[in-house]
């Protein structure tokens, strides 16, 4: 593999000195880019786009042609694992992802197997290999998965949910069935992330989108404990470099210290978190990634720049911060606002860094 020309992102995740704060954006390959919409139309549907390695590679690279981003994230979907388990993923207009065969009983859980990434998810592995070749060392490539709890939410509910009645009903009434499902998923995610690393991912991220829907006790027992198992099982060195692991629980600001105790390298934080306080909470245990409200990108470029400045200042001097949004970029944002953000972060963060940290 080509030598990495820009390792700012990886260094920041490991709290090593950098010349400026690195930035990438959740869902940076997405509908806000006209070139993405063009490829998406050519693919015909979202699932075809995800499962065609050449197209997934192309849309992964698109934002890097426009913006001076410090990392690429492979274009895929968090629901690839349940799809590979045979649940029949489809996308319904206006409703988002749905499953033809939800999992709601003990027997249905027991029937689930752990997918083989090189056969059942070969399209993801091929997209990673292809993208690494195309990147040619320009920036690191991020692999990812949904967390066991978040995957279980979709699998039990059969799609998105506002109240999580089905999965919480299962969790409270049949906790042993819920734990069995989460154990299978933790194993599947670990195998999947390790395969992504072998295929070329240089950092990996766990998206726990729905962890924030749980109480403190239930978050610990049904979400965090399984993410901790994955952190423990993920390969942490490849190609002579450390492979950082990022955990992101949306709405997880109350649990940062506990999350830092999993042994991960970085925590994603959303915009409800005070970055200065978060840094004090986690100390030197982990790096932090975030945390601009995605809606700031609807404001003027000057306001975007001001917000970037405030977030950089809130984190303060030294390495250990990767700038990102607090969640995915919205489809209706204008690309020039992203350009303004990336330029602002790179320019305004320089005074906060020295190589003698």
From Swiss-Prot:
Q: What is this protein called?
A: Uroporphyrinogen decarboxylase
Which biological process annotations from GO are given for this protein? Answer: protoporphyrinogen IX biosynthetic process from glutamate
Primary site of residence: cytoplasm
Locate the residues binding substrate.
27-31, 77, 154, 209, 327
Enzyme class name: lyase
Keywords carried by this UniProt record: Cytoplasm, Decarboxylase, Lyase, Porphyrin biosynthesis
Taxonomic superkingdom: Bacteria
Q: Which organism is it from?
A: Nitrosococcus oceani (strain ATCC 19707 / BCRC 17464 / JCM 30415 / NCIMB 11848 / C-107)
């Amino acid at each position: 593999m080509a030598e990495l020309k820009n390792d700012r992102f990886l260094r920041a995740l490991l709290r090593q000195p950098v010349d400026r704060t690195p930035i990438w954006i959740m869902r940076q390959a997405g509908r806000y880019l006209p070139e993405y919409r063009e490829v998406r139309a050519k693919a015909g549907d979202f699932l075809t786009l995800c499962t065609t390695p050449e197209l997934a590679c192309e849309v992964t690279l698109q934002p890097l042609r426009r913006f001076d981003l410090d990392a690429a994230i492979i274009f895929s979907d968090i629901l690839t694992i349940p799809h590979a388990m045979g649940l029949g993923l489809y996308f319904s207009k206006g409703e988002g992802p749905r499953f033809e065969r939800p999992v709601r009983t003990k027997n249905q859980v027991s029937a689930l197997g752990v997918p083989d990434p090189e056969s059942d998810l070969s399209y993801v592995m091929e997209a990673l290999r292809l993208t690494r070749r195309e990147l040619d060392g320009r920036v690191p490539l991020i692999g990812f998965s949904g967390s066991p709890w978040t995957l279980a939410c979709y699998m039990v509910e059969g799609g998105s949910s506002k109240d999580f009645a089905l999965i919480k009903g299962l969790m409270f009434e049949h906790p042993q069935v819920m734990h069995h499902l989460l154990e299978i998923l933790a194993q599947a995610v670990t195998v999947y992330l390790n395969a992504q690393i072998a295929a070329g991912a240089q950092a990996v991220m766990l998206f726990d989108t729905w962890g924030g829907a749980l109480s403190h006790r239930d978050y610990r027992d049904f979400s965090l404990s399984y993410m901790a198992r994955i952190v423990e099982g993920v390969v942490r060195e490849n190609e002579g470099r450390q492979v950082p692991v990022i955990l992101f629980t949306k709405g997880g600001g109350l649990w940062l210290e506990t999350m830092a105790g999993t042994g991960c390298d970085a925590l994603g934080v959303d915009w409800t978190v005070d970055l200065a306080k978060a840094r004090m909470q986690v100390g030197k245990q982990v790096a932090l990634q975030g945390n601009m409200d995605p809606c700031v990108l609807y404001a003027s470029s000057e306001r975007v720049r001001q917000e970037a400045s405030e977030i950089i200042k809130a984190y303060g001097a030294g390495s250990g911060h990767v700038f990102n949004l607090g969640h995915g970029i919205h489809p209706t944002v204008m690309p020039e606002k992203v350009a303004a953000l990336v330029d602002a972060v790179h320019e305004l963060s320089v005074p906060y860094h020295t190589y003698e940290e």
